[in-house]
């Protein structure tokens, strides 16, 4: 039952940190004990997305170097008392932690938590190797763009080589209107290319920027479509029989006409 | 004929994206230079042409990913070799 999941992508800026924050927050809302681990040493951001940046005293490097105990470095979330963040160090670099230390850290966290979500840095170097060490499963985040899908494919190959089999895919920032126009790759196109199982699809939604501005993960705001999509993603993570959320809410004249002709 | 393509002004740049990706990944996945597939191509050509006349221009060799019956994925080397005619001598 205790599981460590690494959230990775290869390419930067596709939404790893936002995905980590939202999956973790919703798991905690559902009552699970969750630890979020930021492994992006030198460029930490999970603290900001969670709105916990002012509470950092110790970080992941302090823990592995024995400067403090694990419990001292874990920051409890403002909203949910089963949700904790282990922040990355901001003034060190990726070599400050080794894969062996990560494995040990994850083992220690498993004694306290049901789920350990590891936010991976962009790239395929040391930071990536650290982040995947000790993980039981991987979630690969991509956007419907050539560069992001290409990097996702590369990451999938590297995960396989590291014996992290059957990673789950998250397609982020899909724009259904562009998909309809034929100007954005659809879910099927991406699955076709990457050939891995789909965990969830998150629509491009301004509300994500608004919630990030405030340091509040969007799953807290029930109304937005992105929030519903993240909730659906987590439900599917817990039970793969849950159907994928329908993001295609368009009901204009053309939409109905297309459906009539079975083109959409 | 897609009526909506004609009247709706669909530009379908996603098809271009998909096609570019598929080609790109052929090389990325084998993790070697594009020369690797060329070398395989040449060797296949040399062996096969002892037996059949093949259309060299139509020869395509690529690495693909396929879902197996147990739902795991494997990489496969696909060679599409158009035959012009069988060589009489060998048969």
Curated annotation (Swiss-Prot), chain B:
- Family matches, as SUPFAM superfamilies: Cell division protein MinE topological specificity domain
Q: Where does the chain cross the membrane?
A: none
Disulfide bonding pattern of the chain: none
Q: Which Gene3D superfamilies would you find in this protein's record? A: Cell division topological specificity factor MinE (3.30.1070.10)
InterPro entries under this entry? MinE, MinE_sf
Protein family according to the UniProt entry: Belongs to the MinE family.
| Database matches in HAMAP family | MinE (MF_00262)
Question: What's the protein here called?
Answer: Cell division topological specificity factor
Q: Native species of this protein?
A: Caldanaerobacter subterraneus subsp. tengcongensis (strain DSM 15242 / JCM 11007 / NBRC 100824 / MB4) (Thermoanaerobacter tengcongensis)
